[in-house]
């Protein structure tokens, strides 16, 4: 049984400063910055960069001294945080993953633009795997998030 994977959407990299990381991921590697999303209630912000051929890197950085990104940086340092695979049917993927003995955590079907769950690193050789379902591109998804959940800004020349 194989999960209904549509694509490897992005790899998320935990960094202390998105601005400092841009010299590598934008200036040297040629990533095209998309929107910068801030999640104050969870203590982080994120910037996705798209690359030729469709690949993406999501830079995630803490907004302060608390939250999962800060905890990750304190214990592991900067580096790969998770990989996100887009799936055709999230509920089916969860059922199939569990049937295969994989530990699935954090199911969230509340946002119509982005539904997600995670495969525990205990089941994925130390890597967090995010499974997500969305039929919208990044810009369309951003319009559907409630304004109190995300503050959106463009990064032009950060």
For each feature predicted by the language model, list its residue ranges:
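Vicinal oxygen chelate
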Residues: 1-4, 15-23, 28, 48-50, 57, 63, 75-158, ...
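Short, flexible turn/loop "capping" segments at secondary-structure junctions
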Residues: 3-5, 75-76
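Short, structured motif recognition centered on aromatic/hydrophobic residues
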Residues: 8-15, 22-25, 49, 54-60, ...
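An N-terminus-focused feature that recognizes amino-terminal "leader" regions
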Residues: 23-46, 99
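Regulatory and interaction patches adjacent to catalytic/ligand-binding sites
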Residues: 72
